[in-house]
UniProtKB/Swiss-Prot annotation:
GO cellular component: cytoplasm
Manganese among keywords: no
Catalyses which reaction(s): a primary amine + 3'-phosphoadenylyl sulfate = a sulfamate + adenosine 3',5'-bisphosphate + 2 H(+)
Superkingdom: Eukaryota
Name used for this protein in its record: Amine sulfotransferase
Gene Ontology molecular function: amine sulfotransferase activity
Length: 301
């Protein structure tokens, strides 16, 4: 039985979580006024969003870097369409930092051909699938799946928040010339966090000292974030979103290649065939396992 409509709201072809999405914002997205110094982290769900929010916050806020201020990262870098904390996003002081799962075609019109910056983080979709599967089974506001096979069908059909992964990444990449955008690969960030932070800060035109970069790297490692209440989203999970059970955390593993521990050979090969068809001639590389990186550009094996 398909219960997706109970959990999802479809707006102009894209699925959103029904109870958390701010419809007033969605309906006014076209006319949302973008400032030149706005910065957006845009991802498909379960692709490093919270991690990149933490990095952005650390780059921009000295009080975060030196731990003199104890704001939640979600308050520093709120979601545009999921305004859970009811932030006055239009009147926030500059520079405004936002996170979003929006597809390219729902982005505010004035974000095109604008100085405002977008950091698009993408992750190999097999690990996205596994992370999304566990997350959906943990939170009450998403439809649980009894098996990975069941969730994989929904994921490939786009019956999940964010709709179809292939459409999301292709849409943003194929329209990259309309935006001031930097593409970052999750797996590269896992391999070399310091270099990734320097690349992001250079794109943002933020000149950081060695000490500041060191502080950002320390506080932005996935392992450390899991134990920082302001960064790990566990309080949001327990309060605004809600858990089905007490096992697990918002930040689960963040591992590269975790799909190998969950997908059967048949599921993996079936996913490979779909990936090769959907992503043929797509220029961005993908890393499926850090141990097999040399053979991992476009093959989903």
């Amino acid at each position: 039985m398909d219960n997706s409509r109970k959990y999802l709201l479809n707006f102009k072809g894209c699925n959103f979580e029904r109870t958390l999405v701010d419809m007033k914002i969605l309906e006014k997205l076209d006319d949302f006024e973008i400032r030149d110094d706005d910065v957006f982290v845009i991802t498909y769900p379960k692709s490093g969003t919270v991690w990149t929010q933490q990095i952005l916050s650390l780059i921009y806020f000295e009080g975060h870097r030196n731990r003199t201020e104890k704001w939640d990262t979600l308050d520093r870098v709120p979601f545009l369409e999921y305004n859970i904390r009811k932030v006055d996003i239009e009147n926030r002081p500059s520079p405004r930092l936002f996170a979003s799962h929006l597809p390219y075609y729902l982005a505010p019109k004035s974000l095109k051909n604008n100085k405002a910056k977008i950091i698009y983080v993408y992750r190999n979709p097999k690990d996205v699938l596994i992370s999304f599967f566990h997350f959906s089974n943990m939170v009450v506001k998403l439809e649980a799946s009894n098996t990975l096979e069941n969730f994989m069908e929904k994921f490939l059909d786009g019956k999940v928040v964010g709709s179809i992964w292939f459409d999301h990444i292709r849409g943003w990449y194929e329209h990259k010339n309309d935006f001031n955008i930097l593409f970052m690969m999750y797996e590269d960030m896992k391999k070399d966090l310091r270099s990734s932070i320097l690349k992001i800060s250079s794109f943002l035109e933020k000149d950081l000292s060695e000490e500041e970069v060191d502080a950002i790297v320390r506080q932005a490692t996935f392992e450390n974030m899991k134990f920082i209440p302001q960064a790990n989203y566990n309080n949001i999970l327990s309060n605004e979103i809600g858990r089905r059970h007490n096992e697990g955390a918002f930040l689960r593993k963040g591992a590269v290649g975790d799909w190998k521990h969950h997908m059967t050979v048949e599921q993996s090969e079936r996913f490979d065939r779909i990936f090769q068809e959907e992503m043929k001639d797509f220029p961005l590389k993908f890393i499926w396992d850090l141990n097999d990186e040399a053979n991992s550009n476009h093959s989903a094996k």
